[in-house]
Structures are given as C-alpha cells and as structure tokens.
C-alpha cells in the first residue's frame, strides 16, 4: 500500500496546489472527479476483484468527463499545452490497449484451465499455470512503463497570463496525472489478484478437487470480464480525448475526422 500512497502524494500535491477555485463548474467538476479517483487508490489494504473493477469504472467516468469538457473548447484555444497532453494521452491509450490484449489472453487461459479440469488433464493444468506467469510479467511491465511516465505526466504546466485557460490546462493536466497514477495501481492490482488466484495453484494436485477449483476459476473469469468491460470504456474515452485535443490543435479542419473516428470505435 506504500506505493499507492506515494502515487496519491504526487498527484494530490499537484491538485491541492491549484491557485484558486475554478469558476467554471465543468473544470471544478473535473477536479472533484480527479480527487475521487485518487481517493480510490488509497482505499483497500489488499487488491480485490471488486476494488479493481471500481477503479476502472472511476477512471472511465473521469476520462468521459474530460472528453465532454474538451469537446466544448473553442477551436481558437491556444495549443501551448494541448500538444504535450496529446502525447501523454497516446502513451496512456497504448498502455490500456496492451492491457486489454493481456486480459484477452488471460480469458483464454482461464477457458483452457477449465477445460483441463473437466477432462482431468494434469498436463494442461500445469501448462496453464506456467502461462499465467506470462500474464503476470505483462501486467508488471505495463505498470513499470507508466510508473516511469508518471513523473513527466505530473510535472507542472507552463504558466500563462490567461487565467481561465490556465485553470483549464491545470485541470486537464491533473486529470492526466491521476489517470496515469490510477492505471499503474490497476495494472499492479490485477497482477497481485492474479498471483493469489486459482491459476497460481493450478498443479496436478488440484485435479483432485475439480469442483472447488472450477468455482475459483469462474470467480476469476467474472473478475476479468468485469474489468474488461471497464477497460473498453477507458480505451474509448482515451481515444476520444486525443481526438478532441486534435480538434483544439487543428480547428475545423480536424472536426470531420473526429466525428468519423468516434463513430467507428
């Protein structure tokens, strides 16, 4: 839990240092959602399926709120901060795309383990247990990538004399920082949950208790499916956020691209 507290300290320090209360309700609401997401990272003493799913839902709602705000930006808004955020959302989107791919692999692994249990195939059970370690490494690798990215995403936004734009840039940057921090916690959380799941104990001895093992596998499958649904929401929101930022940078020229792209995802 120390890692989660360090993440929260980084981002809370950023959001709590805001110079004044935003007058725009949308910006103030974005700050509130950011703080709520950070509060989630400090909640449990141990990762659980429900907690991970709640975190993904929190992240998805925060990003959707951000997208709603970005869509209402004027095309003439300065691009002094949007270019940086555009690159940061690309990194986040790529990480969550890979996360979704690993979840798909994990689902297939669970299906394979269930089939092995039904047929009392100890060799396939052992293979499933070995393959689980690959998923562990993938989740840990994704967390490490975003952990390295976190200091950059949480660094200060360059000052501007335009007060309203400065508040908007600060809110969006704080959201990006919180999204990166929460993503690290989600990735490490599901890796921790997986490490204590039925897959970790899939050895030939479990074939002697197929009913109990199958129940644990089904529980893990439900957890993965719940997280997967939320991850799709997060992925779509990240893509929409990037396209909204492109609209800010490119103005009316990219508006048609945004409408076409969001209809396709």
Map each language-model feature to its residues.
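Long, contiguous alpha-helical bundle segments
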Residues: 1-265
């Amino acid at each position: 839990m120390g890692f989660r507290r360090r993440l929260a300290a980084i981002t809370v320090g950023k959001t709590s240092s805001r110079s004044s209360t935003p007058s725009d309700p949308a910006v103030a609401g974005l700050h509130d959602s950011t703080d709520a997401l950070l509060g989630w990272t400090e909640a449990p003493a141990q990762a659980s399926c429900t907690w991970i799913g709640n975190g993904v839902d929190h992240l998805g709602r925060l990003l959707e709120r951000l997208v709603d705000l970005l869509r209402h930006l004027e095309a003439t808004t300065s691009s002094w901060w949007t270019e940086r955020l555009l690159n940061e959302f690309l990194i986040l989107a790529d990480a969550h795309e890979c996360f979704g791919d690993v979840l798909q692999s994990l689902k297939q692994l669970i299906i394979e383990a269930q089939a092995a249990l039904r047929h009392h195939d100890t060799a396939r059970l052992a293979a499933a247990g070995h393959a689980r370690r690959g998923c562990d490494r993938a989740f840990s690798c994704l967390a490490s990538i975003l952990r390295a990215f976190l200091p950059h995403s949480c660094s200060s936004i360059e000052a501007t004399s335009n007060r309203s734009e400065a508040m908007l840039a600060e809110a969006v940057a704080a959201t990006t920082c919180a999204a990166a921090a929460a993503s690290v916690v989600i990735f490490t959380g599901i890796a921790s949950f997986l490490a204590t799941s039925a897959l970790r104990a899939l050895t030939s001895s479990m074939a002697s208790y197929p009913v109990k093992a199958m129940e644990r596998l089904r529980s893990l499958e439900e957890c993965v499916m719940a997280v997967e649904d939320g991850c799709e929401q997060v992925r779509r929101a990240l893509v929409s956020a990037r396209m909204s930022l492109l609209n800010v940078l490119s103005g009316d020229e990219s508006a048609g691209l945004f409408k076409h792209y969001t209809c396709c995802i």
